[in-house]
């Protein structure tokens, strides 16, 4: 089991943060990174949903101490409904906060081939488009850091063999057996058996599909100007820009994208000007000065964007959209 050379090259020249749970996947990735002599620290969420949750946290602290690594831990609140989405949002918000505050270049995730195929099937079942169906990439640029998934083309069976061969300790997550979570239902009934039998062909297919995705959507069309992400008025490009800001859109939200200026998920704003989409963090301002409002009116700056420009002292004349 090996990490690709191009991913290793990135890891060796940046400051790295590993999302760690002490489950099988992140434990395997921990020791694989150690084997490759990659420097990294740990970040962990304790959801307190399992009987071993606090023990996992304690053991993670001991592991970090043993190998001289920093570890950042946060306890999640009890989510009353829609656990999967709320837990994911909570997790990534904390990961991003640590990356920004501690200047990490890379957030390393332990997603593997089985996860990639599960995601594919989940999105397919929801009627998603190509950009969402192929939502996982080995290297995914966010605004201030990059997501890296070194195990994305490695199967769960290969990870299990690595753990057994190296005699690596990890905690079994019993919640993975609970089919009330949609991902677990897909895993148990559809994806795992398929990946076990056809993993080599699946790896090739996902590799080809990713190349096709890049050519089709040309994500280089997303430009950044002073914190604003700007792209042509194209649903998939806009969804990608929103994801770069840390928000994964639902099918219902995607349907609203091209209808006009809006706020997505209460935190990401979308505005249009001259057939260009502008994606940015949603902000408000108590009162805009009259002269600034007039400058915005003359320049035809979308109303939703004005508070952001004012708060960040962005010169309107410097904007090229």
From Swiss-Prot:
It catalyses: cytidine(34) in tRNA(Ile2) + L-lysine + ATP = lysidine(34) in tRNA(Ile2) + AMP + diphosphate + H(+). Belongs to the tRNA(Ile)-lysidine synthase family. Keywords: ATP-binding, Cytoplasm, Ligase, Nucleotide-binding, tRNA processing. GO terms for biological process: tRNA modification. It comes from Campylobacter jejuni (strain RM1221). Its main location: cytoplasm. CDD domains: TilS_N. This is tRNA(Ile)-lysidine synthase. ATP binds at residues 21-26. It is found in: Cytoplasm. The keyword Transferase does not apply. InterPro entries: Rossmann-like_a/b/a_fold, TilS/TtcA_N, tRNA_Ile_lys_synt, tRNA_Ile_lys_synt_N. The gene is tilS. GO terms for cellular component: cytoplasm. The N-terminal region contains the highly conserved SGGXDS motif, predicted to be a P-loop motif involved in ATP binding. Ligates lysine onto the cytidine present at position 34 of the AUA codon-specific tRNA(Ile) that contains the anticodon CAU, in an ATP-dependent manner. Cytidine is converted to lysidine, thus changing the amino acid specificity of the tRNA from methionine to isoleucine. It comes from the Bacteria. GO terms for molecular function: ATP binding; tRNA(Ile)-lysidine synthase activity. The keyword Nucleotide-binding applies. Its EC number is 6.3.4.19.
